[in-house]
Amino acid sequence: MQSYKYDKAIVPESKNGGSPALNNNPRKGGSKRVLLICLDLFCLFMAALPFLIIETSTIKPYRRGFYCNDESIKYPLKVSETINDAVLCAVGIVIAILAIITGEFYRIYYLKEKSRSTTQNPYVAALYKQVGCFLFGCAISQSFTDIAKVSIGRLRPHFLSVCDPDFSQINCSEGYIQNYRCRGEDSKVQEARKSFFSGHASFSMFTMLYLVLYLQARFTWRGARLLRPLLQFTLLMMAFYTGLSRVSDYKHHPSDVLAGFAQGALVACCIVFFVSDLFKTKTSLSLPAPAIRREILSPVDIIDRNNHHNMV
């Protein structure tokens, strides 16, 4: 009768007599975690650095000339804005972060999904990753926008109203006018040179499209099939309305808004698919190696098997 022996894979013991998983130094793990958080914050700061420098310094946009008969820059200056900067930032950031907080809470505590992080609280780890990716995308989008504004210096539709050049000193027969002096307030004149591309369009498209993709990945409830598409449609319409309002307010040309939409959508897709883990395949927990079965033959069986081979 044959007997079998099963060999099990044994975890190598550490110097302290236990397994490595049980002998990790908590202080070492905590310091490593703090170091990684500091590295993330440094990357976030570097992504936002161009935006911070341009907004807080006296960097002036490129000084572009104009044509006297250019009707696209002769619109009046509207004092009030349909959607000002404060409303744009508040709505875009608050809605996105609230949606992420709710979505990650539902995923961790209701769906019981696990996090790969070593943090004891998986909800905090998931929230840190998703909010961090969103803010990183915001920083990149705004830095791209401000770099384009100061580098290109396209004139806004209300430029001549703000600049108020002295046409008595300008010879319009020369065609493209480069030598001119603005009599308007300098800060408003410099702002009127930042038409391309629309910051409202790029920021609103990034935040809303990021939320659309977040809902696509996290909103898994199948009770109402049209609820998720309705929410996604609403978010995109909010972004489109924000961009189109800039044309109605004479702040941007239509091409500025289209370029802003394209930039915001591109950054949102890159952040979602290449930085975050929203659409990455979930890996199952690794199973232990199967037991190895070894056949042990008795002396009689060995003799019989040898005789069989000799006869062959």
UniProtKB/Swiss-Prot annotation:
Name of the protein this chain belongs to: Phospholipid phosphatase 3
Record pathway: Lipid metabolism; phospholipid metabolism
GO cellular component terms, A-Z: adherens junction; basolateral plasma membrane; endoplasmic reticulum exit site; endoplasmic reticulum membrane; endoplasmic reticulum-Golgi intermediate compartment membrane; Golgi apparatus; Golgi membrane; membrane
Keyword presence, Phosphoprotein: yes
Localization: Cell membrane; Basolateral cell membrane; Endoplasmic reticulum membrane; Endoplasmic reticulum-Golgi intermediate compartment membrane
Transmembrane intervals: 34-54, 86-106, 124-144, 195-215, 227-244, 259-279
CDD domains: PAP2_wunen
Entry EC number(s): 3.1.3.-, 3.1.3.4
Disruption phenotype: The homozygous knockout of Plpp3 is embryonic lethal. It is characterized by a delay in development, absence of chorioallantoic fusion at the 6 somite stage, allantois compaction, impaired remodeling of the primary capillary plexus of the yolk sac and gastrulation defects with low penetrance. Persistence of open neural tube is also frequently observed. Conditional knockout of Plpp3 in the cerebellum is associated with defects in postnatal cerebellum development, modifications in the cytoarchitecture and arrangement of Bergmann glia with a mild non-progressive motor coordination defect.
Distribution of this protein across tissues and organs: Detected in lung, cerebellum and heart atrium.
Taxonomic placement: Eukaryota, Metazoa, Chordata, Craniata, Vertebrata
